[in-house]
């Protein structure tokens, strides 16, 4: 399986901005999640972010919160998510990034959690509520099992911390495009361009922009501003949840293709 860093390196060689879709594990079911991962992989995703449903998702907007609630109500738990991943990941071209809050990691233990995640075939990890001051232990232990822990920079992040986050972040840097939670918005805030420029002054690591990227034109905008990846979550989660499972899978396939087209450089 290809690492997150290797994937970004190959994309940079082709001057290609990555597409990173996000879906919630277990919504509408783990069986459909497995199919959705394969659909996204086949329809142009460069990397895929998979959210572990959690009861108190502070960074998530209403669409992803509702998906997590539905998944938990159906009994979706971490062990079942990892079991599903272990069957699907070996057949994916795209590296798989697990999005989880810190509480499940803490309760399981950092080392056992990371070992199980690595054994399942996960290549990257995003923990939105992990403070920088507590990240070093997770970073070290994640690297030991071949997992890259990506850290987040937000519009509210003090400039004094941006360089420290950029230095520690592995795989890429996750740039949050707006204050507040995830969700679909009508446009990408202009502040994102400024933040991209600030980050590019202190690091040459890839930068992915997420939160509020919900339309092909949003993805193209962040690409034109110099982002290395467009991360799209709520718009995929919403489409997958609408209609029958088969209709949801068809909808995310179409949407994935439209985003990929928007991110394809014009000769």
Swiss-Prot record:
Keywords for this protein: Amino-acid biosynthesis, Aromatic amino acid biosynthesis, Lyase, Tryptophan biosynthesis
CDD domains, sorted: Tryptophan_synthase_alpha (cd04724)
InterPro entries hit by this protein: Aldolase_TIM, RibuloseP-bd_barrel, Trp_synthase_alpha_AS, Trp_synthase_suA
Enzyme nomenclature, EC number: 4.2.1.20
Catalytic activity: (1S,2R)-1-C-(indol-3-yl)glycerol 3-phosphate + L-serine = D-glyceraldehyde 3-phosphate + L-tryptophan + H2O
Pathway: Amino-acid biosynthesis; L-tryptophan biosynthesis; L-tryptophan from chorismate: step 5/5
Signal sequence, start to end: none
GO cellular component: cytosol
Paired cysteines (S-S): none
Domain of life: Bacteria
Role summary: The alpha subunit is responsible for the aldol cleavage of indoleglycerol phosphate to indole and glyceraldehyde 3-phosphate.
Assembly: Tetramer of two alpha and two beta chains.
Family stated for the protein in its record: Belongs to the TrpA family.
Protein name: Tryptophan synthase alpha chain
């Amino acid at each position: 399986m290809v690492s997150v860093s290797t994937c970004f390196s190959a994309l940079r060689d082709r001057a290609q901005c990555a597409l990173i879709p996000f879906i919630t594990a277990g919504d509408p079911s783990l069986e459909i999640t497995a199919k959705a991962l394969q659909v996204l992989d086949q329809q142009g995703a460069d990397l895929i972010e998979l959210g572990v449903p959690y009861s108190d998702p502070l960074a998530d907007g209403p669409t992803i919160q509702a998906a997590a609630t539905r998944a938990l109500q159906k009994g979706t738990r971490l062990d079942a998510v990892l079991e599903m991943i272990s069957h699907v990941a070996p057949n994916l071209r795209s590296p798989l990034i697990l999005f989880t809050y810190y509480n499940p990691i803490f309760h399981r233990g950092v080392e056992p959690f990371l070992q199980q995640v690595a054994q399942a075939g996960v290549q990257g990890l995003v923990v939105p509520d992990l403070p920088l001051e507590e990240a070093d232990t997770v970073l070290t232990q994640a690297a030991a099992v071949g997992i890259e822990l990506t850290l987040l920079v937000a519009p509210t992040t003090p400039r004094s911390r941006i360089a420290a986050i950029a230095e520690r972040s592995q795989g890429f840097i996750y740039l949050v495009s707006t204050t507040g939670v995830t969700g679909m918005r009508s446009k990408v805030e202009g502040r994102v361009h400024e933040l991209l420029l600030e980050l590019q002054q202190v690091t040459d690591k890839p930068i992915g922009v997420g939160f509020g990227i919900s339309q092909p034109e949003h993805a193209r905008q962040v690409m034109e501003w110099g982002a290395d990846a467009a991360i799209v979550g709520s718009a995929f989660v919403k489409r997958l949840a609408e209609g029958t499972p088969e209709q949801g899978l068809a909808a995310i396939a179409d949407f994935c293709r439209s985003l990929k087209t928007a991110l394809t450089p014009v000769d």
